[in-house]
Amino acid sequence: RNQVEFVISTEPTDGGIYRGHRGRMEIRVDMHGVSCHGSAPERGDNAIHKMAEVIQNVRDLNENPADDSVEIKGLVKMLDPKYNPEHWEDARFLGRGTCTTSQIFYTSPSRCAVADSCAISIDRRMTAGETYQSCLKEIEDLPACKKYAKDVKVSMYMYDRPAWTGHVYKTECFFPTWIN
């Protein structure tokens, strides 16, 4: 565990004292396709259709159980000592991690053409035992991402907006889990 000396949280807590918080990160998945005219979609490679499979996998990752009956084990697995031997108790205290598709973007030459790219944003909440590296790998290992490996890129968003002084300080969109 990290040794936290103090935390000031402006998030409403209903007067409660918190001794931990799930982490958060913002993940981006980009899918490449090939555009063509919508009257002959078989001539292209629809990035939106491929991304639809990724989106379903993200949903499964969030909702599935952790047992062997499913191809994608759900995030609830981190509450089990079998999958998270060092941190399962802290994970149970904080609650399981979650993920959801929060935005979708696409490019296409027109409304009557096959999309040549599609991207999604994933809001990922992390529990004890998860790192940003493990969360990125979890998305890269989804069946649809493996299926379209040559056309998919998984990355973490970066904050790069200028401060009031104009200085740009690039930083990852990642806030680690902490518990004390």
Question: What do these predicted ranges mean?
Answer:
Residues 1-26, 91:
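Acidic/histidine-rich catalytic neighborhood of metal-dependent amide-processing enzymes
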Residues 12, 26-180:
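Metal-dependent amide/peptide-bond hydrolase catalytic core
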